[in-house]
Design a protein with these regions (language model features):
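Short, flexible segments with low predicted structural confidence
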Residues: 1-3, 18, 34-35
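Short, surface-exposed ligand-recognition loops at beta-strand->loop->(often short) alpha-helix junctions
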Residues: 9-22
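Short alpha-helical segments used as structural interaction elements across diverse proteins
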Residues: 1, 20, 53, 72-74
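A broad, structure-centric signal for solvent-exposed, well-ordered loop/edge residues
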Residues: 17, 48-49, 88
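An amphipathic, aromatic/His-enriched active-site/gating alpha helix that lines ligand/cofactor pockets
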Residues: 24-37, 56-89
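Short, well-ordered beta-strand segments in beta-rich or mixed alpha/beta enzyme
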Residues: 2-8, 40-68
């Protein structure tokens, strides 16, 4: 399984708008993409505030999160992570 992690730092004062964009735009687009099995939103309300979207894929994703038209994020990045099983031997 492949996990894609998208992380974005939210512009001060735009946290609620940023989370709403991820919920209403980004998650549905990801879930409608071929191979996407699940999506999970994580938030950090400290300084700086940030939003993380974890998506799980059965194939290497061909997916770009893009950015909304408004200024919600000061920085965003994505990376693919491969899941490994723990070795308890």
């Amino acid at each position: 399984m492949i996990v894609r992690m998208w992380e974005a730092v939210v512009v001060p004062g735009r946290f609620d708008d940023a989370v709403e964009w991820v919920r209403r735009d980004l998650v549905p687009r990801a879930l409608l993409s071929e191979g996407c099995l699940a999506a999970e939103i994580l938030v950090h309300e400290g300084t700086p505030e940030s939003v993380v979207l974890l998506t799980r894929w059965d194939v290497a994703p061909v997916f770009e999160e893009g950015v909304p038209d408004s200024e919600l994020f000061s920085r965003a990045r994505a990376q693919h992570l491969q899941t490994l099983r723990p070795d308890f031997t």
